[in-house]
């Protein structure tokens, strides 16, 4: 991806795209709204299609336009195609710790991504939502760790409702995207600035 040149129509240096996928009612829209608007939206939407949200962020003194794509109404894995994934700089899988079926389907989601993007290496990150309701947990942390290790992806337990590990996770993802794209373009970065390899649980 090439760096954007500033011009009268652009007030940012670059644009990053993150797409959220996963089963219905796991909190994808709630996570996005918590980060973009700092509000909790109980996920009751029935919109068909893909919604997108925008937020201007600053990374290493560069203005970045973040576009977050919410696959509302596209929760059936078969509906997701290359055209959905190819815009992404990072793909976020979401499950809910109180819904074991949403966890069990993650393997199918990951395989669907690989099938649609066989020659690309778009990073995948797992957010296990609703960690504030520990008493109804159906997905053991050990299972999350096993899946993370099996596919070499990072994961975090989070809560959109209680705002746990939301901002920190987006900051980590944005920094990783920035590093990946600017290294690829030979623009140089500080050594040792990567934040990858972080798995977080509720605390």
Regions found by a protein language model. Name each.
Residues 64-78:
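Switch II (G3) loop of P-loop NTPases
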Residues 68, 94, 127:
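Generic enzyme active-site microenvironment
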């Amino acid at each position: 991806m090439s760096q954007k040149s500033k011009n009268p129509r652009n007030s940012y240096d670059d644009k990053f795209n993150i797409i959220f996928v996963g089963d219905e009612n796991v909190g994808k829209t709630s996570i996005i709204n918590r980060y973009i608007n700092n509000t909790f939206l109980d996920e009751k939407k029935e919109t068909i299609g893909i919604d997108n949200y925008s937020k201007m962020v600053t990374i290493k003194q560069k203005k970045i336009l973040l576009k977050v794509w919410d696959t509302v109404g596209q929760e059936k894995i078969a509906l997701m195609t290359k055209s959905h994934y190819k815009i992404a700089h990072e793909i976020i899988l979401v499950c809910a710790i109180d819904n074991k079926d949403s966890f069990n389907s993650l393997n199918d989601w990951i395989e669907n991504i690989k099938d649609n993007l066989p020659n690309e290496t778009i990073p995948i990150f797992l957010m296990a939502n609703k960690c504030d309701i520990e008493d109804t947990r159906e997905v053991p942390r050990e299972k999350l760790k096993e899946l993370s290790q099996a596919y070499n992806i990072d994961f975090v337990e989070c809560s959109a409702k209680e705002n746990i590990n939301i901002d920190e996770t987006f900051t980590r993802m944005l920094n990783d995207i920035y590093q990946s794209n600017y290294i690829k373009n030979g623009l140089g970065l500080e050594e040792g600035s990567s934040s990858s390899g972080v798995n977080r649980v509720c605390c």
